[in-house]
Amino acid sequence: IVDVGPEVSERGRKVISSFVRENQEFDDLEHFIENVRKYDPYRSREHIERTVKYNMIQRVDGKFVSKCDSNPRRAGAQGQMAEKDNVTLEEARSFDFPVLILRGETSNILEPDAATRFRDALPQGQLIEVPNCGHNVHSQNTLGFLDAVVPFLEGLN
């Protein structure tokens, strides 16, 4: 489980929602790239440019927009739907299998104390804090992500 849990930071959610809302369309891709660099300082410019190449399209009016429909995120529907689908700490106590929780060192979504409570609720829970990344562990520190996940997977029967 990567940087989420039964208790997610509302402050962090608002930061992400705000970024999505404020970055809907652009006249110039460079403007979007600079916004992403400010928002996500762990990602290299090359990585952001590659992401932009595959995830943005230019409309007939010349504006650049995401290929993904962001309306549910803009409307806040995603957060409301996710809330009712979240596993509670009480439910986590019944998970009778190994669970690895990864938390980004500077995550604004899964706070350290919430990650610890989640791990403690899991009978076979492990928690690893991956350095040099925030919420997007896999893309902000891919090697750190793999260093955590591979041994866990290799240890499963």
Model-derived regions: residue spans:
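Flexible "cap/lid" loop of the alpha/beta hydrolase fold
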Residues: 1-31
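Conserved serine/cysteine hydrolase catalytic core
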Residues: 58-120, 126-129
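Helix-loop "lid/cap" segments that line or gate small-molecule binding pockets
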Residues: 17-22, 31-43, 54-57, 76-82
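Active-site loop/turn elements of alpha/beta-hydrolase fold enzymes
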Residues: 1-4, 106, 130-132
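Catalytic active-site module of serine/aspartate enzymes centered on a nucleophile-bearing elbow/loop
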Residues: 124-157
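Residue-level signal for the nucleotide or nucleotide-sugar donor/cofactor binding architecture
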Residues: 27, 110, 140
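Active-site loop signature of alpha/beta-hydrolase-fold enzymes
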Residues: 7-9, 109, 133-136
